[in-house]
Amino acid sequence: MKSIIEILIARIAFWLGYGCRSITTNRNQFSRGIQKINMLLAEVSHDILETPGSIKPQPGLTPTMLNWSVYMTIEHTDQVHVEILHLIELLERGERPNLGDISRFDTVGPAGPDVLKDFYKHARQIETLPDRISLTSRNRVHHRIFGSLNSRGLYAALAMHLWLHVSQIKAILEKHAQKYSREQ
């Protein structure tokens, strides 16, 4: 469980880094994250992408996440993004959804290349969401770390969440590269 101080720091960092940005800026930041993942995964073997890598702690990552593979990280990221898309749609319809316990997204089993198809399909839905939905709902959903978020705040969370895991994917691949270079 995070301390009050950690939660306040995370909230301030979120709102300064993403929450006060325009929808267009967050969309562009999300798109750059997808491009970065494409670049990181280019020409990396499936064996490496499905092999867990034990990485150093990073802000925003739970201890469980530190031992995931790239594919597991992508599966988790996609699951969270699908849930946020659903919450945004509910808020925009005038509903008041409940996010529930976010730790449920920390349980990811072994994953393979099949996760990429859904990940990229949902990423495209996220990139085009502002063209389809106004993101003006006044209704809110409570996030235990970031507080009360409307649909625009949730859209900002998509970009923030993606970049959190871009750095995780980069660290996993660097860990595998170090291991490979030691074996040579």
Where are these regions (language model features)?
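Aromatic-glycine hotspot motif
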Residues: 1-184
